[in-house]
Amino acid sequence: MDPRARYPPGIGNGRGGNPNYYGRGPPPSQHQQHQHQHQQPPHPHHHQYVQRQPQPQQTPHNSQHQQWLRRNQIAAEAAGASEQKAPPVADGIDSSSQDWKAQLKLPPQDTRYRTEDVTATKGNEFEDYFLKRELLMGIYEKGFERPSPIQEESIPIALTGSDILARAKNGTGKTAAFCIPALEKIDQDKNAIQVVILVPTRELALQTSQVCKELGKHLKIQVMVTTGGTSLKDDIVRLYQPVHLLVGTPGRILDLTKKGVCVLKNCSMLVMDEADKLLSPEFQPSIQELIRYLPSNRQILMFSATFPVTVKEFKDKYLPKPYVINLMDELTLKGITQFYAFVEERQKVHCLNTLFSKLQINQSIIFCNSVNRVELLAKKITELGYSCFYIHAKMLQDHRNRVFHDFRNGACRNLVCTDLFTRGIDIQAVNVVINFDFPKSAETYLHRVGRSGRFGHLGLAVNLITYEDRFNLYRIEQELGTEIKPIPPQIDRAIYCQ
């Protein structure tokens, strides 16, 4: 392509689809000038802009191309003068915008069925938000095709600088809903922490930082993750290098801030993912102290599936006029079918064995209510001849990281865990969740079953209910306004397999 028109109409230097943004390419090299010695400069004072000789038969595209070159001349001549209105762009935007898209390394298209939780959109495209070209490249190469409903609502508002209180179901694209505006607003030439993303667990911190790195892989943005249970010394050394976006747990970030290593005076955006958990008594004091280190004009984005009373108190104090997004017409995901089976405690392992033999499991997560029961059940499942990992909060951090990584990469079919794993963990291959021990609260139940049926796909939740659990089952059904049916002798694979 001619270097003088390196950025075709409508998608200027580093901007996606903005017809008012003009990018100017570098002047042609000496080799190129030698090639076109027969050409005359169009203006005596602007030798670097060289116009081609007219072709005998011009196609509309060539005409558009020349129009663009001439527009560059006009822009150069008008430097220092008042800004001129851009002439209307013809149908060149759509055709020329395919040039950079054609070079993208797109993943295989996901052709599985998706529910309305992610498809009921207004029809917007990511390019409608005038994002940086490099960020758009990362978005498409991550496999995102169009914004989900929560992304449509939050991305344009977050880009304006408003505070946001967003409530949406698990697995509907909340992470990208705050990562995309965060990456867009970061000035990569400014060596300072500009965005902090707070999450309640170490696994979620690793997952979120990975999403940020993948979306921003064409940007020169440095992402760092820091959590408790890892080397403080390594984090301190890392913070002396450039860091633009920091992801971590509140306690560790506060610790680094108090030591004067993590400087937040230029941090313009604070994101709280799983905000209801972050505002529990365990984390809230750390977060309130951390906010004191932020500038007064900072922007706060809060995302969660559930918002208890503690969130309201925090909102009233720190988010006086937030933009409220509520996409929770119902609490459970449309694609998840829920069943229960009445069993005695001593029959649970036998029942689990029957489920393994009858269900078409891609990957499953099995929840227990205590650390001891996790380890015992994992041992039993292995004895039955099924591959199984387990994870809980009392394991060493390195071991937890390895299990999480291996399970996500498909090294094992079944994972037994405590509620540590209920928040935000996004493993697309999981299509079955089994509550070996039924949870005590509706909130926990909601987060557990939300591990299957990610991003509008189909999933199955099976609950093993003892005599003592029967009242809890009824109460949770009422609170969530959902139906948990008795398990039939045969389950149609079409309801949870794509």
From Swiss-Prot:
Gene Ontology biological-process annotations: mRNA processing; mRNA transport; negative regulation of translation; P-body assembly; stress granule assembly
Alphabetized, the UniProt keywords read: ATP-binding, Cytoplasm, Helicase, Hydrolase, mRNA processing, mRNA transport, Nucleotide-binding, RNA-binding, Translation regulation, Transport
Q: GO CC annotations?
A: cytoplasmic stress granule; P-body
Q: Where is the composition biased (Basic residues)?
A: 33-49
- EC number(s) on file: 3.6.4.13
Q: Which SMART domains match?
A: DEXDc, HELICc
Q: Where is the Helicase ATP-binding domain?
A: 155-325
Pinpoint motif DEAD box by residue range.
273-276
Q: Which InterPro entries match?
A: DEAD/DEAH_box_helicase_dom (IPR011545), Helicase_ATP-bd (IPR014001), Helicase_C-like (IPR001650), P-loop_NTPase (IPR027417), RNA-helicase_DEAD-box_CS (IPR000629), RNA_helicase_DEAD_Q_motif (IPR014014)
- Chain positions covered by the region annotation Disordered: 1-109
Q: Where is this motif: Q motif?
A: 124-152
PROSITE patterns named among the record's database cross-references: DEAD_ATP_HELICASE (PS00039), HELICASE_ATP_BIND_1 (PS51192), HELICASE_CTER (PS51194), Q_MOTIF (PS51195)
Tell me where in this chain the Helicase C-terminal domain is found: 335-495
Q: Where is the composition biased (Low complexity)?
A: 50-61, 75-86
Instruction: Tell me where in or outside the cell this protein is found.
Output: Cytoplasm, P-body
GO molecular function list: ATP binding; ATP hydrolysis activity; mRNA binding; RNA helicase activity
UniProt-annotated binding residues for ATP: A168, K169, N170, G171, T172, G173, K174, T175
**Where is it mainly found?**
cytoplasm
Catalysed reaction equations from the record: ATP + H2O = ADP + phosphate + H(+)
Highest taxon above the source species: Eukaryota
* Alphabetized Pfam families for the sequence: DEAD, Helicase_C
Known role: ATP-dependent RNA helicase involved in mRNA turnover, and more specifically in mRNA decapping.
What is recorded about the domains? Answer: The Q motif is unique to and characteristic of the DEAD box family of RNA helicases and controls ATP binding and hydrolysis.
UniProt lists the family membership as follows: Belongs to the DEAD box helicase family. DDX6/DHH1 subfamily.
Q: What is this protein called?
A: DEAD-box ATP-dependent RNA helicase 6
Q: Which organism is it from?
A: Oryza sativa subsp. japonica (Rice)
